[in-house]
Amino acid sequence: MKITLIAVGTKMPSWVTTGFEEYQRRFPKDMPFELIEIPAGKRGKNADIKRILEQEGKAMLAACGKGKVVTLDIPGKPWTTPQLAEQLEAWKNDGRDVCLLIGGPEGLSPECKAVAEQSWSLSPLTLPHPLVRVVVAESLYRAWSLTTNHPYHRE
C-alpha cells in the first residue's frame, strides 16, 4: 500500500520540508509515503473562490487516481494514535492505495468531500496547512511503529 498526501500549496518554508522529509524517509519500503503538491489558485480581492476550489479539487482527485480518498477536515473523525494504527491496518487490508487530501486556505472542494470515504480531523482547531503536512507524516509514522512494535511509540 502506498500513502499519498495530496496538498494544495507549493514553496513551503524550509522547516516544513525538513520536518516532512524526516518522517517520510522513515517509512518502510512496503509502505511508501509520497507528497504531491497542487499549485494553489491565484487569490486576489476579486478571485472567484468557488471556481478556484473546484479547480484545486479536480487536480487533487486526478492525482489520487483510484486510491481510497481520505480528507483532512475539522468536522472529520478524530483518531487517537491506537485508532490511527487500526485505520492503517484496515487500509492495508483493503488493498488499495490511500490518498490523504489537505485543502488550501478555503479548505476542500465539495467534490473532494463527496468522494471521500473517510474524513480525519487532527484537531478542532484550524491548523496552518503547512504544519498539517508535518503532523500527518509524524502521526502516520507513529501509527506504523505501533503496528510493528517498533520502539518509536511509547505509551
From Swiss-Prot:
Protein name as annotated: Ribosomal RNA large subunit methyltransferase H
Gene (name only): rlmH
UniProt subcellular location: Cytoplasm
Phylogenetic classification of the source organism: Bacteria, Pseudomonadati, Pseudomonadota, Gammaproteobacteria, Pasteurellales
UniProt source species: Haemophilus influenzae (strain PittEE)
GO CC term, one of those recorded: cytoplasm
Molecular-function annotations in GO: rRNA (pseudouridine-N3-)-methyltransferase activity
Function: Specifically methylates the pseudouridine at position 1915 (m3Psi1915) in 23S rRNA.
Entry keyword Protease: no
Family from the record: Belongs to the RNA methyltransferase RlmH family.
NCBIfam families noted in UniProt: PRK00103.1-1 (NF000984), PRK00103.1-4 (NF000986), tRNA_RlmH_YbeA (TIGR00246)
